[in-house]
Structure formats: C-alpha cells, structure tokens
C-alpha cells in the first residue's frame, strides 16, 4: 500500500485551523449588515396614505359654501342642550348627523339652515324646497340629488324611515307632526323664523345645532346692522300710506289678500317707514281677502303686489291696464309696484326678508336712499350668508330677479 506523505496532510490541517479562528467582520454601530440595504423600504401603504402630506388640505367644500368656512366644526364635541322656539330643552350627546327638514313651505327653514356650511353634509332629507319659481337649495348643494325628498304632507312614518337623529320643524307643526315624531323617540327642534326678533333667536339655536355659534353671531350682526341703518335713514320722514296685497288667481278667480298684523309683511312696512293701512280692519290669523271697493277706499299712496306663483311683473302690468285699477290714485301716480324677489319673493319670513326691507324702504323713501343699489345688495347678501362668489350670483341669481327694481 502506498503511504501518503505527512507533509501535505499537515499543511491542510494548519489551513483549516487558521480559517476557523479568524475574527468575524464586525460592523460599526448603526451600520447595516452587508447583505441588507442601508434603509430598507417601508412596507407598502394603503393608497390613501401614500400621498398624505404632513398637513393635509381640508376637504373641498361645496361651491356654495367655499367662502363660508371660517367656523370649522371642532374635532370633538361635548354633550349640549338646545332650547327651541317652544322653550323645550333638547339634549344631544353629539352633534346630529342625520337631520331632516319637514313640513310645508320648508324652504324658509332650509334657507336658514344652509347659512351654516355644515348643513349640506348633515341634512339627509327634506321636502320640496321650491316655491314654483325655482329651488335655491338644489343650486347650492351638490349632494342635493342624493338626499331623500319627502312629500309635502309626509307623516311620521315616512320621516322615521330616513332614520333621522334630528327633525327641524316650524313650531306650528308641534301638535300635528312633532308630537308623533317625539313619540317614536326622534328628537325634534321647533323654530319660528317669522319675525326679525325670532330670526335673531332661532339662528342662535341653529348655530348650536351645527356647532357654529360664531357663525350665527356674525349673521345676526349682519341683519341687525341692516335694520338699524334703514331705521336711522327713515327716522323723521313722513310715512306714506301703504297697501301690500297678495295676488292669487286660483281656479281662475282673482283675489287680493292682506296679511295679519304680526306677519313679516306688516313688520317690513313699519320698519321701512310706511303706514300699513290694513291694520285698520279686523284681521285673521292668515291672509284676509279684501274687495276692490275696500282697496279703493283706503286711498293708498303706494301699493305693492305680491305674487308667489306667477310672475309679479305680468300681474302688475295686467292691473295697470284694468280700468278699475286705473281709477286708483296710486296707479295714476305710478306708485303700483310688484314686490321684488329672486327665486323667492322678498316679503316673506325667509332669510331674504332683509333684502325686502332694504328694497321697500328705498321705494317708500327714495330721497333717503340715493345710493341704493339692488345688485350690490344681492351680491353682498349671498356672499355673506352662503359664501357665493360674484360669478355664481351673476349666473344663477341675478337672472331670477323680478318685481319693480330700481
């Protein structure tokens, strides 16, 4: 047998021992292992988080409220209590998120609620917010088509089906609609919104509901300053004798009606420096029909015609061509006017009553309002209340103006 030389074997053993005792490579503190990258990529984020900036932009607001965002909702709200128009204490653990506006002529409630930018997100159902000449809420709320539209006579069952956490109602509906809703355990807040004083109070209530008290205070200041400016301007002026007549031709029968003493039309006349002649007769709780003989007997200095469902300019032109109306002194002297409005007439207890007051005062006392500019007033109103810019107002609101505008 051939024997192997011991020298090669010895050399192999020495080589193996040297390899096994060599020091391992040690990295300095913080250095990455050789087989790894210096900063491994983070785990893949969900798509929404990949583009997130340290200070994300606020969500885009509907066009109608972009400029009305200085009063953001606080990130968390404590329980709060609201006192409504009936003096009821309504408690909320959190701000309501599914609000329903119901009842007839609800556009007056809706227009007031939408003063608050949060309304578009929080209101989930309402009745028809139009008055025969358009729907303002549909213009300014991009989500209007996604809301449930209730029938004008919707009952508690239809309203409850929307699963509201708050229903806003005019106070006169407390017994007929409010009580059944309360029985179902649905919170109800009642609002009046019938007089300037009630507007001041009820806007504060809406400010509490939408967690925007500063917004309510700012709008109340706007209203109050406008009223004070008009009152100061007409102070000491001779009061013209005024008639405000609501025109209707239901079923082809023409009728003229005067409002109660407590209604907005009467209040506006007095605030604007006029004498409302209809206060001389016995008035009911609603519109009171008067004859042409009574209208003639009043011998008004200025007559204002209201028409909710027909172009008021057409109505006044028709009356001016009527021989019986031509015999009236106000008509002969060119003092028969169609009450101004846009999508809604400005005589009503809607948010636009302040536009009606300014317009009426300028018609009754033009010498006291030489700088009155109806277009400027309209633009300021919609900017202040709804954050609508001039381009929007020029395109969507100005073309709807009606009545006898200076």
Where are these regions (language model features)?
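Bacterial Sec-exported substrate-binding components of ABC uptake systems
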Residues: 3-6, 18-111, 214-247, 369-406
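Extracytoplasmic substrate-binding proteins
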Residues: 79, 176-254, 278, 287-289, ...
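Short helix-initiation/N-cap motifs at beta->coil->alpha
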Residues: 87, 145-157, 194, 282-292
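Short, solvent-exposed loop/turn elements at domain surfaces
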Residues: 90-92, 107-113, 131-137, 250-255, ...
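Structural recognition of the beta-strand scaffold that forms the well-ordered cores
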Residues: 100-102, 124-127, 150, 166-170, ...
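A short, structured surface patch at a secondary-structure boundary
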Residues: 101-160, 166-172, 277
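Short helices/loops that flank or line small-molecule/ion binding pockets
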Residues: 155-163, 184, 289-299
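Alpha-helical, coiled-coil/dimerization segments enriched in small aliphatic residues
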Residues: 256-286
């Amino acid at each position: 047998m051939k024997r192997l030389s011991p020298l090669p074997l010895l050399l192999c053993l020495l080589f193996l021992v040297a390899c096994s005792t060599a020091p391992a490579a040690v990295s300095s503190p913080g250095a990455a292992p050789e087989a790894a990258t210096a900063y491994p990529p983070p785990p893949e984020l969900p798509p929404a988080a990949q583009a997130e900036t340290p200070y994300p932009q606020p969500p885009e607001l509907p066009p109608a409220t972009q400029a009305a965002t200085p009063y953001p909702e606080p990130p968390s709200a404590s329980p709060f209590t609201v006192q409504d128009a009936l003096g009821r204490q309504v408690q909320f653990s959190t701000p309501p998120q599914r609000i329903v506006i119901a009842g007839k002529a609800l556009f007056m409630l809706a227009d007031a609620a939408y003063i608050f930018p949060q309304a578009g997100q929080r209101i989930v159902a309402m009745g028809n917010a139009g008055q025969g000449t358009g729907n303002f809420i549909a213009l300014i709320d991009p989500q209007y088509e996604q809301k449930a539209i209730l029938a004008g006579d919707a009952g508690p069952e239809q309203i409850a089906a929307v699963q509201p956490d708050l229903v806003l109602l005019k106070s006169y509906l407390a017994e007929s609609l409010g009580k059944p809703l309360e029985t179902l355990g649905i919170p109800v807040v009642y609002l009046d919104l019938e007089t300037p004083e009630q507007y001041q109070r009820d806007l504060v209530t809406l400010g509490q509901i939408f967690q925007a008290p500063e917004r309510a205070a700012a709008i109340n200041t706007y209203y109050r300053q406008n009223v004070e400016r008009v009152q100061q301007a007409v102070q000491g002026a001779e009061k013209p004798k005024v008639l405000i007549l609501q025109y209707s031709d239901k079923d082809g029968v023409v009728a003229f009606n005067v409002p109660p003493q407590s209604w907005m039309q009467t209040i506006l006349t007095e605030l604007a420096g006029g004498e409302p002649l209809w206060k001389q007769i016995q008035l009911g709780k609603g519109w009171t029909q008067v004859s042409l003989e009574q209208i003639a007997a009043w011998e008004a200095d200025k007559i204002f015609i209201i028409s909710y469902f027909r172009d008021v300019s057409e109505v006044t032109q028709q009356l001016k061509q009527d021989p019986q109306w031509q015999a009236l002194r106000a008509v002969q002297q060119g003092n028969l006017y169609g009450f101004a409005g846009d999508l809604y007439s400005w005589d009503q207890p809607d948010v636009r009553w302040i536009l009606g007051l300014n317009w009426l005062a300028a018609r009754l006392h033009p010498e006291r309002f030489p700088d009155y500019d109806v277009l400027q007033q309209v633009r300021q109103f919609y900017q202040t209340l709804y954050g609508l810019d001039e381009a929007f107002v020029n395109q969507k609101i100005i073309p709807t103006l009606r009545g006898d505008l200076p």
